[in-house]
Amino acid sequence: MGKDSQNYYGKHGTPQKYDPTFKGPIYNRGCTDVICCVLLFLAIVGYVAVGIIAWTHGDPRKVIYPTDSRGEFCGQKGTKNADKPFLFYFNIVKCANPLVLLEFHCPTPQICVKQCPDRYLTLLSARNTRDFDYYKQFCVPGFQNNKGVTEILRDGECPAVITPSKPLAQRCFPAIHASKGVLMVGNETTYEDGHGARKNITDLVEGAKKANKILEARQLAMQIFEDYTVSWYWIIIGLVIAMVLSLLFIVLLRFLAGIMVWVMIVMVILVLGYGIFHCYMEYSRLRGEAGSDVSLVDLGFQTDLRVYLHLRQTWMAFMIILSILEVVIILLLIFLRKRILIAIALIKEASRAVGHVMCSLLYPLVTFFLLCLCIAYWASTSVFLSTSNTAVYKVVDDTACPLLRKTCNPETFPLRNESLQCPTARCQFAFYGGESTYHRALLGLQIFNAFMFFWLANFVLALGQVTLAGAFASYYWAMRKPDDMPAFPLFSAFGRALRYHTGSLAFGSLILAIVQIIRVMLEYLDQRLKAAQNKFAKFLMVCLKCCFWCLEKFIKFLNRNAYIMIAIYGTNFCTSARNAFFLLMRNIIRVAVLDKVTDFLFLLGKLLIVGSVGILAFFFFTHRIRIVQDTAPPLNYYWVPILTVIIGSYLIAHGFFSVYGMCVDTLFLCFLEDLERNDGSAERPYFMSSTLKKLLNKTNKKVAES
């Protein structure tokens, strides 16, 4: 038996030995992993430099405003096109050219206009009539009516024809509609191409479709943005409700941990049960309605997601998912009912610890603020980098011109000899790009931007974990709680983390950031290789993605426990990670059961809060609450604010529960160390509370004798 124990501990390190001077987090400590601290500082300096360069070269207007053939923005204030917000295509049919999909730009002249055409006219019919005054606004700026029709069309100064159009994403598209199954523009089923020939409306449809493919995503984004502008204050109210519920739940958990856990379990089951009932009622209501039996596969992807809610198959899928989730939760509760009692006791102990360090509940706000700074800097830098390309002009022509698609300068092109080879060619804005060293390095800068975001975000999270671990470890290792605790345990732990362990936090977050950026690159490669038919490559990609996902989860778990050891002992990252890993391996059964059951209970708490707020948001934004039915704003997609509230509620609940989670993990690790260091004798008494000692049938002999 002794040999087996020796071999076991040899594999997983040696147990902690009794140290009479150890009274909790060590105060006399030195700086750890200084090299990583210096590396983080240099990386931040480089990140700031990248941001400055991006802000110098970038121009977000390229994303906001459409651009005409001269590379000028439509509708931008302070420019000559300030009163011309719409982009007009001379010949929308040419947008059906494959060049559109290659360079995302139609090979036809484009100008900024005040309004889209509202009537059908051709240059031939409008010339020398009163209609030409209206027609001229769709010609190039500075147009002089001193040429013949042929010369005007050859030089691309006016469109051959204008058709009734409607603005979409600040672009003018033909107002095509169907009347009794026949496509029409205005009252016409055909249109004149401006050269005396009549063509079918379907040609316009093809051109509009190709141009519209580029804009579908932007249109969806604009509609989502509109929904946010009219519902943002209701979203904030929903998030405030989630915050109040989370805080109320935490406060109640402080005093009624056992009852609250069981109430939480019952409420989650009831919420899921109501979800199943609601899905069944919607499924039954749609029975017999026209179009409700269409399958999701036949329908395909639709930008208007409300279409899916009119399908019976959608509600059937929701009902099956919720039913499976309900059954899984009930089975877990049945088989883990005894372990749940132990987890409740651990939560009660965590409640006492949080009660003595109440300011810890506010620390997630600090983490949230720092993460918002990281996200804002990353997003703005990413936008400026993506818009720091310069305008690229290329030769466009309807004939087989040898200069076709070659780069040109619009100011000098008409004067150069090359233009004589193709008299009808035009030098037109194509896209934003560049061939300088800076432009070639843009992809690398974007990768660096993403990597630094992961590194800094993980560093912020690590700082919060070390701070909370130090505060709660001070509680556990106080023999007389709370008399032996320091005056300000949270601030003391925060100061120690920044002063001594910035390098260790940078080291741990760097390892995690490397794995995360590799996962992002794998996702990028997977998207690029989706069209490939090589099954081995697909299999290899799936394996790599799975392996790195597991690796990320393991590193997060190891880092979390390493940070607890850093907060207690002040050792470097590698030593702390090794000691934490061996300590957990020596108590693997307790780790697998107690810790994970507690995590499961916290997850149920998050689901209860998110489910409650989500159901309330659903009924409000779908105008199903009669008292406030007229208050809810009209929306393009009511799922936009609902999903935002649900995701935001989860993040808020996660922020509050993360304090409890870190407290439980810290107390659990301290408890394992306590069992190894001490034996309950008068010389080596346990530091754990009387509740935990009773739960585990442990006693201090001195207390037992008295």
Swiss-Prot record:
Name by which UniProt lists this protein: Choline transporter-like protein 2
Membrane side Cytoplasmic: residue ranges: 1-33, 254-256, 337-364, 478-504, 585-599, 660-706
Sites carrying sugar chains: N187, N200, N417
Subunit structure comment from the entry: Interacts with COCH.
Superkingdom, natural source: Eukaryota
Extracellular topological intervals: 55-232, 278-315, 386-454, 526-563, 621-638
Keyword Mitochondrion: yes
Task performed by this protein: Choline/H+ antiporter, mainly in mitochodria. Also acts as a low-affinity ethanolamine/H+ antiporter, regulating the supply of extracellular ethanolamine (Etn) for the CDP-Etn pathway, redistribute intracellular Etn and balance the CDP-Cho and CDP-Etn arms of the Kennedy pathway.
Modification note: Glycosylated, glycosylation differs from tissue to tissue. The molecular mass of the mature glycosylated protein is highest in kidney, followed by lung, colon and spleen, then brain and tongue.
Annotated localization: Cell membrane; Mitochondrion outer membrane
Gene Ontology CC: one annotated term: mitochondrial outer membrane
Designated gene of the protein: Slc44a2
